From Swiss-Prot:
Upper lineage: Archaea, Methanobacteriati, Methanobacteriota, Methanomada group, Methanococci
Protein name: UPF0305 protein MmarC7_1691
Any one Pfam family match given in the protein's UniProt record, by short name: DUF2115
Protein family according to the UniProt entry: Belongs to the UPF0305 family.
InterPro entries per record: DUF2115
């Protein structure tokens, strides 16, 4: 698939994500994170619901002409979408969460080539993604052995490579 074609599709999808979807997605994620430590959960939710709406705005404000023209393996897009659909529980708000995440994550992976988490996100142990000389380094990149993880698609390198 052509990058501009994918971007055009994602831009169209970005307009389908409403304020109600954002609210439902937040309720969904809060419930899905019930058993995580409160301070970690609070920080993650703040970062997520600052970062993802910012990326949605970015998608809406860009034009197709601003997107570099290149080919993207459609099988990779399908793999990402399948993983995103498999993550988390099937609680109320799931559809809103999926709509938001599929649009933003596909944009970050295939079009914008940026980390999938905000640079301010604190991971267990208090570590964050580090940007150095145009490269991103993640403290959990190689720690994710879950077959449903989408880390393998993220542009970040492992923090140990720094």
């Amino acid at each position: 698939m052509n990058s501009r074609k994918l971007f055009s599709k994602l831009k169209e999808e970005s307009y389908d994500v409403s304020i109600f979807d954002l609210m439902n997605a937040k309720v969904y994620l809060e419930k899905d994170m019930t058993y995580l430590p409160e301070d970690y959960k609070k920080g993650y939710l703040e970062d997520f619901f600052t970062f993802f709406p910012e990326v949605l705005r970015e998608i809406k404000n860009k034009t197709e002409e601003e997107i570099e023209d290149f080919e993207i393996d459609e099988e990779e897009i399908k793999k990402v979408d399948l993983r995103l659909c498999s993550m988390g529980s099937k609680k109320m708000g799931r559809n809103s969460y999926e709509k938001l995440v599929k649009t933003v994550i596909n944009y970050l992976i295939f079009i914008n080539k940026r980390p999938l988490h905000a640079l301010t996100t604190r991971f267990p142990g208090g570590k964050q993604i580090i940007e150095k000389n145009g490269n991103y380094y993640c403290p959990i990149k190689n720690a994710q052995s879950n077959e449903l993880s989408i880390c393998e698609f993220c542009i970040c390198k492992d923090l140990n490579e720094l």
